[in-house]
């Protein structure tokens, strides 16, 4: 996926989950943050960031904060909408006969439903932006929705669907994602139960470009 236009900035602070103050060309701008997660280990004062320039003149904010430079790691794409977009592009190249985003299964909306021949597939997508000592972790904040989705996938797997949870690693040099049990042990338990039921765990490694994010490798978890 590609962004329309990118500007460079320096992160100042984040008054709330939705906005941040960023210095752009010597002036402090209020920008929209495309990730409501905490991201405390990423958004440090003085850190270099990348902003997508909005083409909507009616918007209150001119910029969206989409990437941040993490010391010792490199650029991290922190756009929470990016994982589903890149997976949609990636799935289109995987030979499925039919792909439907935002598929209702049970009481959940699963990110993707696919068909290939007679086989039906479900895939839930999780974006990973948290790195500690060279390992990716998910979630960075408790997610009851994420736990619920894993239970739904395990149930669907038992009913004949081929199910997968795909972790999109939104940074380079990281090849695996582990459940962040210190933040939410329930997610780790649900992931283990889903794997035991036959749900596939995928790590999707990405190239983080200046104005793009692209899946370049798939690994089994």
Question: Can you describe what each PLM-predicted range is?
Answer:
Residues 37-50, 154:
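Short nucleic-acid-contacting surface segments enriched for D/E, G, S/T with interspersed K/R
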Residues 9, 110-140, 153:
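Conserved catalytic cores of phosphodiester-cleaving nucleases, focusing on short active-site segments
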Residues 27-41:
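Beta-strand/loop nucleic-acid-binding surfaces
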Residues 170-221:
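Domain-level recognition of nuclease-like catalytic cores that cleave nucleotide substrates
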Residues 134-144, 154-183, 205:
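Nucleic-acid nuclease catalytic cores
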Residues 16-21:
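Short aromatic-glycine-enriched beta-strand elements
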Residues 40, 72-101:
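Acidic-basic catalytic patches of nuclease active cores, encompassing PD-(D/E)XK
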Residues 44-56, 205-206:
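Flexible glycine-rich surface loops and low-complexity tracts that mediate binding to linear polymers
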């Amino acid at each position: 996926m590609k962004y329309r236009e990118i500007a460079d900035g320096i992160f100042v602070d984040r008054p709330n989950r939705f906005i941040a103050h960023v210095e752009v060309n010597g002036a402090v701008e209020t920008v929209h943050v495309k990730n409501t997660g905490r991201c405390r280990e990423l958004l440090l004062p003085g850190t270099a960031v990348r902003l997508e320039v909005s083409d909507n003149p009616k918007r209150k904010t001119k910029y969206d904060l989409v990437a941040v430079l993490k010391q010792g790691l490199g650029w991290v794409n922190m756009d929470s909408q990016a994982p589903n977009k890149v997976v949609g592009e990636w799935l289109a190249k995987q030979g499925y006969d039919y792909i439907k985003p935002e598929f209702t299964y049970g009481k959940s909306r699963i990110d993707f439903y696919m068909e290939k021949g007679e086989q039906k597939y479900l895939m839930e997508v999780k974006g990973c932006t948290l790195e500690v000592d060279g390992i990716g972790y998910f979630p960075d904040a408790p997610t009851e929705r994420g736990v619920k989705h894993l239970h739904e996938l395990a149930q669907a797997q038992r009913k004949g669907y081929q199910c997968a949870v795909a972790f999109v690693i939104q940074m380079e040099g990281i090849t695996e994602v582990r459940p962040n049990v210190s933040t939410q042990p329930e997610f780790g338990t649900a992931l283990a139960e889903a794997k035991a039921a036959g749900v596939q765990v995928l790590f999707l490694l990405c190239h983080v470009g200046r104005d793009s994010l692209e899946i370049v490798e798939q690994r089994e978890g």
